[in-house]
Amino acid sequence: MNITAKTKKLGIIGFPVEHSFSPKMHNYISDKLGNDYIYTGFTVAPDSLGDAVRGIRALGMRGVNVTAPHKTEVMQYLDRVDPRAKRLGSVNTVVNDNGVLTGYNTDSDGFFAAPRHSGIEVRGKRVLVMGCGGVAKPTLMRMTEESP
């Protein structure tokens, strides 16, 4: 990986983030695909969240993932929030499009993409969700949105 001033910057913000596998995973995939991206973790204390979000724009970062405890509070610092994220009251992805910061909630995307990738359609099926972690609410909401 050759990092230059043109390398696109990505990351994850949370408190703490040292436990996250995201940097290792994203940098590995980026390197294998030949993308000019770098992804790093940023420990952001709750009282510094506004400064951190302004830093995304100021540094020209392409975007960040958002983890606990910032998924709700981050919304107040964004220019736009996707309708699904608004309904959930939770943002886990911030995209910087030429200085406009938009928040999304992509927590349920993997839940639906994995079976489809394997040729399994979950629409119209009975599904059991075990647990109530951060992905449960977005997944259940999306199931109700996509149910026939």
Give short role names for the model-derived ranges:
Residues 14, 103-108, 116, 120-148:
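Glycine-rich adenosine-cofactor-binding loop
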Residues 3-118:
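Phosphate/diphosphate ligand-binding glycine-rich loop within oxidoreductases
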